[in-house]
Amino acid sequence: MGQTLTEKIFSAHTNKQVSAGEIIESPIDMVIGNDITTPLSIRAFEESGATKLANPDGFCIVMDHFIPAKDIASANQARISRDFAKKHQLKHYFDERDMGIEHAILPEKGLVLPGDVIIGADSHTCTHGALGAFATGMGSTDLAYAMITGKNWFKVPPSIRVVFKGKLQEHVYGKDLILEIIRQIGVDGALYKALEFQGDTIEQLSMDDRFSLCNMAIEAGAKNGIIAADSITKEFLASRKSLRAEPKYYQADADALYEQTIEIDVEKLEPVIAYPFLPSNGKSISQAVKDDLKIDQAFIGSCTNGRLSDLRIAAQILKGKRVHPDVRLIITPGTQQIYKDAHQEGLIDTLLEAGALISNPTCGACLGGYMGILGDNERCVSTTNRNFVGRMGARSSEVYLANSAVAAASALKGKITDPRKL
């Protein structure tokens, strides 16, 4: 019997044929921590008596949740990671001087590669599956174990094959593909399974859209989301200044055993809006327009949709116009490099002239930490990945998940708007 893409990667790392359901211990190529989760890992690392990282070049800390510090507590917490990075002379450490959201900056820096096994103490580590890697989130103690040993244990997940067919309509993106699959299968429809994305739609999808797609695999309960590397992947890698190692390319076998195959024709797919309070509560933009949903805030950013293409989409829609007077539009570039590139393209000026607020790269608004918190009964259309009760602020606030075009168009009109109708 053939193997799925996830099984292929684990087999290569363990030097044996593995299949779904097996418990294995695998070497880790990249271990990722951030300013919130790494301090707990550092504590466990030091309490174990460890003094050296098993693989210093395969460990990365990204300060992205509360950086610059939002208060004294977060400033003190950040010092733990900073001191550890300095003590161990970490090569891959990203702070205020070269900052970015972890799941945007690692691909940008060439630190995650096809064929890798990647773990991170952040649930959206699955983003990196867009590059053809196995990538999943774990807890801080699991991270500490990998810091000490360079390995971790896994139960090889069964795979669901998701085949997207057809050409996407204007202003329908990778974000809409993942919101549609979550709408169909629910937030636990892929519980501890690999979502392997295939089809001619995927073959035409940009890397930025692939990152958005894989980013939200966890919102369906998936262990990981993954796309086989192809010419688009290779073009992306070729544009990096350097790569951590040589990529390893794998493809699923034609006779691979999948637990389920889901086929979706995207030809008639509209932009999808996930209503409160679950990412699975998806409705079409046409329905959202009928519901006449006035908004207080629009947010464009996060590890889901804070890439250069998202800023280009927003600038195209907002150019020469002004944000509705009742709406706050907050835009958070995913990395400093994205910010710089957007500035060089004139996007930042366009967005500022439209009335947007441009923040530093941060996860702050997405998790209701800072830089975009919602007050009582406020409503936000957001390009983030979660819309649980109180996710971005007050428990009575509402978050509607959407793509960047919808968020920008809605900011203009003061209510959730179909960007295709502008």
Swiss-Prot record:
Which SUPFAM superfamilies does the UniProt entry name for this protein? Aconitase iron-sulfur domain
Record-listed [4Fe-4S] cluster binding positions: 303, 363, 366
**Cofactor requirement:** [4Fe-4S] cluster
Q: Which Gene3D superfamilies does the annotation name? A: Aconitase, domain 3 (3.30.499.10)
Upper classification of the organism: Bacteria, Pseudomonadati, Campylobacterota, Epsilonproteobacteria, Campylobacterales
EC numbers for this chain: 4.2.1.33
Q: Which reaction does it catalyse?
A: (2R,3S)-3-isopropylmalate = (2S)-2-isopropylmalate
Provide a GO biological process annotation.
L-leucine biosynthetic process
What does the record say about how the cofactor binds?
A: Binds 1 [4Fe-4S] cluster per subunit.
**Which function does this protein serve?**
Catalyzes the isomerization between 2-isopropylmalate and 3-isopropylmalate, via the formation of 2-isopropylmaleate.
Leading EC class? lyase
Question: What is this protein called in UniProt?
Answer: 3-isopropylmalate dehydratase large subunit
Assembly and partners are described as:
Heterodimer of LeuC and LeuD.
The record's section on InterPro entries has:
Acnase/IPM_dHydase_lsu_aba_1/3, Acoase/IPM_deHydtase_lsu_aba, Aconitase_4Fe-4S_BS, Aconitase_4Fe-4S_dom, HAcnase/IPMdehydase_lsu_prok, Homoacnase/IPMdehydase_lsu, IPM_dehydratase_rel_enz, IPMI_cat
Is Transmembrane set as a keyword in this record?
no
